[in-house]
């Protein structure tokens, strides 16, 4: 067979080569301290060829075992630092946190869907980001605000339990049900109501998540602007995002019409207990009252709302799915968890949030799930300026990948790290707050996830209800040891196969009287 190179592909390759040669002439190498060790780089593509054919966090872990916990890669033209140990994570998240406080820029999909980085997750470190963080801590995701969504959580989870109960003895796709549940909770918290249009919004958001996993050459060579313009992905993302934007525009318009002013007694209620406002109301109030020193347009509000769905739902959805899968694979853990929740809520017939703090073993299960299966296995940062770690030079504008998945399976800190053992967290001081660098499922430092309490609230109650009301069997007579625990990596690390289970109501459940 004759191998033919298209003229267009050759021109692109030739253009990249000329661009990189010109860049090297413009920025000649200086006699500086060395970069961290790493595998040899090929011309133009660097180490790009070594990152294909598997899950990135697995590949990076394997490379770090040869080149060390502080490793340098070249991904296209991007200088990339990979962190794979607790000690190096501390350097990034604490010692040099200010130097590593940016998020990666010039990512095609994220640039479009975040309205040019106007959201919380992807905005660059500076005055605007600091103001957004303050808004999150005081208004959007404060303890009072999260508590104000308690009715939404309890009502939504109870409805899912009723749906499962109506299918007792039949196979249910628990993965799909969990996804629908968490999206529904977030939609009601953000928009105040649930409608068919919000279902369309969720479908579009899922499509963007899928597109975000596509390999984009322009992301590897951001200095070559023509690559982004020529990318077929740009058209697809812009087409989907246009529909998302239309829905968000309608939502903002409706909220403005329905909630022009707030009476004084409502303001007092807002201050005392989180009020009845949804998140769109809160953002519109901030805009109307001029509480931001930096510009705060409708685009900023829409970017933040989209954040709530993309970042605010995936972690909880994936964690509940993984936790149930791990308990199905480890019947000993399932049995102990069911006994705990049924004892704590004995005689009540249902589970609410009043006694969740008493479920210590369930809390340990959640922590262990997020250790073995962190929703974001790689925490991404970008350096603001050059710094030095362990005698190595860390360039400015370098991409940084903290392999949280590898660190949380480090046998130096976690005995028998690949086994699911919630008991390791009983009596342990290790928590989600980012101060224990061997365990950072929500990141750490100044850019730690601001929605930890919101995420955990959306994980605890569904799990407690699933454990309380039902005994579970794997579909098709599958044995626990046969359950497929393979993962796929999109914008988060989720199970490859949906979790198909057969529910049977437990005698303590009062659901049958409610269905």
From Swiss-Prot:
Pfam families: p450. Its main location: endoplasmic reticulum. Signal peptide: none annotated. InterPro entries: Cyt_P450 (IPR001128), Cyt_P450_CS (IPR017972), Cyt_P450_E_grp-I (IPR002401), Cyt_P450_sf (IPR036396). Heme binds at residue 449. Its EC number is 1.14.14.-. One of its GO terms (molecular function) is oxidoreductase activity, acting on paired donors, with incorporation or reduction of molecular oxygen. Glycans are attached at residues 173, 259, 352. Keywords: Alkaloid metabolism, Endoplasmic reticulum, Glycoprotein, Heme, Iron, Membrane, Metal-binding, Monooxygenase, Oxidoreductase, Transmembrane, Transmembrane helix. CDD domains: CYP71-like (cd11072). GO terms for biological process: indole alkaloid biosynthetic process. Pathway: Alkaloid biosynthesis. SUPFAM superfamilies: Cytochrome P450. It is found in: Endoplasmic reticulum membrane. It is a single-pass membrane protein. Belongs to the cytochrome P450 family. Component of the monoterpenoid indole alkaloids (MIAs, e.g. echitovenine, tabersonine, lochnericine, 19-hydroxytabersonine and horhammericine) biosynthetic pathway; MIAs are used in cancer treatment and other medical applications. Cytochrome P450 catalyzing the conversion of tabersonine to lochnericine. This is Tabersonine 6,7-epoxidase isoform 2. The gene is TEX2.
């Amino acid at each position: 067979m004759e191998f033919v190179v298209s003229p267009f592909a050759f021109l692109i390759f030739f253009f990249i080569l000329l661009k990189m040669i010109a860049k090297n002439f413009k920025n000649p190498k200086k006699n500086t301290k060395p970069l961290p060790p790493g595998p040899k780089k090929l011309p133009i593509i660097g180490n790009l060829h070594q990152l294909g054919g598997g899950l990135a966090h697995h590949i990076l872990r394997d490379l770090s075992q040869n080149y060390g916990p502080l490793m340098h890669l070249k991904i296209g033209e991007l200088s990339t630092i990979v962190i794979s140990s607790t000690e190096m994570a501390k350097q990034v998240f604490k010692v040099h946190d200010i130097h590593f406080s940016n998020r990666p820029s010039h990512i095609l999909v994220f640039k479009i869907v975040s309205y040019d980085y106007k959201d919380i997750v992807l905005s660059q470190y500076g005055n605007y980001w600091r103001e957004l963080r303050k808004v999150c801590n005081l208004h959007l995701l404060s303890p009072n605000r999260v508590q104000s969504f308690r009715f939404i959580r309890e009502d939504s989870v109870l409805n899912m339990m009723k749906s499962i109960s109506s299918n007792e003895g039949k196979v249910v796709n628990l993965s799909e049900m969990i996804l629908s549940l968490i999206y529904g909770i977030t939609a009601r918290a953000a928009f105040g109501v649930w409608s068919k249009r919000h279902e369309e919004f969720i479908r579009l958001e899922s499509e963007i998540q899928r597109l975000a996993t596509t390999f984009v050459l322009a992301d590897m060579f951001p200095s070559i602007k023509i690559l982004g313009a020529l990318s077929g992905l740009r058209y697809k993302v812009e087409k989907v995002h246009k529909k998302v934007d239309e829905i968000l525009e309608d939502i903002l318009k409706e909220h403005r019409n329905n909630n022009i002013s707030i009476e004084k007694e409502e303001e007092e209620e807002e201050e005392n207990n989180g009020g009845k406002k949804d998140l769109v109301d809160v953002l519109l109030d901030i805009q109307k009252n001029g509480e931001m020193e930096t510009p705060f347009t409708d685009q900023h509000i829409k970017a933040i709302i989209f954040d709530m769905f993309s970042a605010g739902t995936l972690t909880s959805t994936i964690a509940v799915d993984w936790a149930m899968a791990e308990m199905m694979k480890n019947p000993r853990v399932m049995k102990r968890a069911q006994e705990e929740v049924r004892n704590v809520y004995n005689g009540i017939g249902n589970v609410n949030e009043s006694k969740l703090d008493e479920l210590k073993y369930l809390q340990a299960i959640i922590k262990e799930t997020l250790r073995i299966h962190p929703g974001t296995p790689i925490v991404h940062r970008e350096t603001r300026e050059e710094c030095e770690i362990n005698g190595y030079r860390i360039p400015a504008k370098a991409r940084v990948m903290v392999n949280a998945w590898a660190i949380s399976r480090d046998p130096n800190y976690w005995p028998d790290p690949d086994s699911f053992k919630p008991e390791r967290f009983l009596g342990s001081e290790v928590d989600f707050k980012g101060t224990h660098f061997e365990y950072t499922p929500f990141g750490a430092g100044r850019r730690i996830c601001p929605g930890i309490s919101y995420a955990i609230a959306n994980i605890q109650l569904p799990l407690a209800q699933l454990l309380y009301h039902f005994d579970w069997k794997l579909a098709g007579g599958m044995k626990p040891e046969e359950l497929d625990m393979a993962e796929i990596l999109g914008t988060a690390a989720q199970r490859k196969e949906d979790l198909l289970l057969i529910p049977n109501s437990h005698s303590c459940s009062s659901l049958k009287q409610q269905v």
